[in-house]
């Protein structure tokens, strides 16, 4: 009889945070919203808060960066560790150290699905439909996958069954699609700057932005709009038609997450050939099933917010069963290892985190070390051939462990 590898049990889980409300502005890391001054990601982007004039100029003005980065580390009995980062900050640390630890410690490093199911069910009474608790569960799940990969000596994508393509091609999200084209990306997605409170004038301004970028980028480069939950159905339909002459590939997340009927109406009334996409701020498997049933062309879960890699794999299966694409919200290595195994993810997102989008910068800088970035808009699978997710934790960051058990 052949010997079967004996896997260790998990000895301890630990949680740190960095950045957030008490830190200096611009910590970056897992909370990529936390950037310094004069950064495109915080420059008059339309949001659900834009209707309040005190909060329309900056997303940080209403507190988008108050949570900070959560870092979860799991240690096996043999001393090996896995870790991951997400956006949950100090409150996520409390949930891990004071509640979720009981479902993690003492389990085999391969018991990822069991731990995941126990975490989901044990937090159901206070997690609702996602949010902070789901971000925290996602971070734990990713850390477990990282540990499992390191213990068995395989990259996470091989644990999922292996790559279905040799490389991942990317579009870039940022304020300058024209610069993204020069860097070799297949497309560029811009934020909208105006919303229903701005009336038809807002539609004209955002459509003019798309027209200008179409002229700069030429006809064959993809252009998309990210509306970040800032619109209502009527406004979104008007904006979609105003941008149709400029060959907009898709219009994204126009409505708040739970407006499923609104997404169905938007899809029904969108210009022919223009895709309707959403999912970044959906936090449960059921919400993605409902989104899929309402005709979304592309589902866009964030693996750090939707329940982790374990849930992302299930979301991809739902999308595949309906002939839909799943293109995760940019999550660096945590989505790279997933999408290279999905047959219904022909491309992926890279979030430009340099202030003016003119240079390539790792998305979760500075918290991750050895984080890969696309070269000519692509990442080859060989770049991912390291155990786990293939990155290291930068312990020189100001990591704080406020709780223990």
Curated annotation (Swiss-Prot):
Binds 1 Mg(2+) ion per subunit. Pfam families: MR_MLE_C, MR_MLE_N. The keyword Metal-binding applies. Transmembrane segments: none annotated. SMART domains: MR_MLE (SM00922). Gene3D superfamilies: Enolase-like C-terminal domain, Enolase-like, N-terminal domain. Its cofactor is Mg(2+). It catalyses: L-rhamnonate = 2-dehydro-3-deoxy-L-rhamnonate + H2O. Its EC number is 4.2.1.90. It comes from the Bacteria. Substrate binds at residues 33, 59, 349. Mg(2+) binds at residues 226, 252, 280. InterPro entries: Enolase-like_C_sf, Enolase-like_N, Enolase_C-like, L-Rhamnon_dehydrat, Mandel_Rmase/mucon_lact_enz_CS, Mandelate_racemase_C, Mandelate_racemase_N_dom, RHMD-like. GO terms for molecular function: L-rhamnonate dehydratase activity; magnesium ion binding. The record marks 302 as: Increases basicity of active site His. Keywords: Lyase, Magnesium, Metal-binding. CDD domains: MR_like_2. One of its GO terms (biological process) is amino acid catabolic process. The active site is at residue 329. Reaction proceeds via a syn dehydration. Homooctamer; tetramer of dimers. Catalyzes the dehydration of L-rhamnonate to 2-keto-3-deoxy-L-rhamnonate (KDR). This is L-rhamnonate dehydratase.
């Amino acid at each position: 009889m052949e010997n079967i590898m004996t896997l260790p049990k998990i000895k301890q889980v630990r949680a740190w945070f960095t950045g957030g409300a008490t830190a200096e502005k611009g910590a970056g890391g897992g909370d990529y919203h936390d950037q310094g001054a004069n950064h495109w990601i915080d420059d008059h982007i339309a949001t659900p808060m834009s209707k309040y004039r005190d909060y329309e100029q900056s997303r940080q003005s209403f507190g988008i960066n108050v949570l900070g980065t959560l870092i979860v580390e799991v240690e096996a009995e043999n001393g090996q560790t896995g870790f991951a980062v997400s956006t949950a900050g100090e409150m996520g640390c409390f949930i891990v150290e004071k509640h979720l630890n009981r479902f993690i410690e003492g389990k085999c490093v391969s018991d990822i699905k069991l731990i995941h199911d126990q975490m989901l069910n044990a937090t159901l009474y206070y997690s609702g439909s996602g949010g902070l608790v789901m971000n925290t569960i996602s971070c734990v799940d990713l850390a477990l996958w990282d540990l499992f990969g390191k213990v068995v000596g395989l990259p996470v994508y091989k644990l999922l069954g292996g790559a279905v393509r040799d490389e991942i091609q990317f579009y870039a999200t940022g304020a300058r699609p024209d610069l993204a084209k020069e860097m070799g990306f297949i497309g560029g997605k811009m934020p909208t700057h105006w919303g229903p409170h701005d009336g038809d004038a807002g539609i004209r301004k955002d459509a003019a932005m798309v027209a200008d970028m179409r002229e700069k980028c030429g006809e064959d480069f993809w252009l998309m709009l990210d509306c970040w939950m800032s619109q209502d159905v009527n406004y979104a339909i008007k904006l979609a038609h105003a941008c149709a002459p400029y060959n907009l590939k898709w219009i994204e997340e126009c409505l708040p997450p739970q407006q499923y009927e609104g997404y169905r109406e938007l899809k029904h009334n969108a210009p022919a050939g223009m895709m309707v996409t959403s999912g970044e701020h959906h936090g449960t498997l059921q919400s993605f099933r409902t989104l899929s049933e309402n005709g979304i062309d592309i589902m866009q879960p964030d693996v750090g917010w939707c329940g982790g890699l374990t849930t992302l794999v299930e979301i991809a299966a739902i999308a595949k069963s309906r002939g839909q694409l799943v293109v995760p919200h940019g999550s660096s290595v945590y989505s790279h290892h997933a999408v290279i195994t999905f047959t219904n993810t022909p491309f992926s997102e890279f979030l430009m985190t340099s202030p003016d989008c003119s240079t390539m910068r790792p998305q979760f800088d500075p918290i991750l070390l050895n984080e890969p970035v696309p070269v000519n808009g692509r990442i080859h699978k060989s770049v991912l051939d390291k155990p786990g997710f293939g990155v290291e934790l930068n312990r020189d960051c100001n990591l704080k462990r406020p709780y223990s058990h």
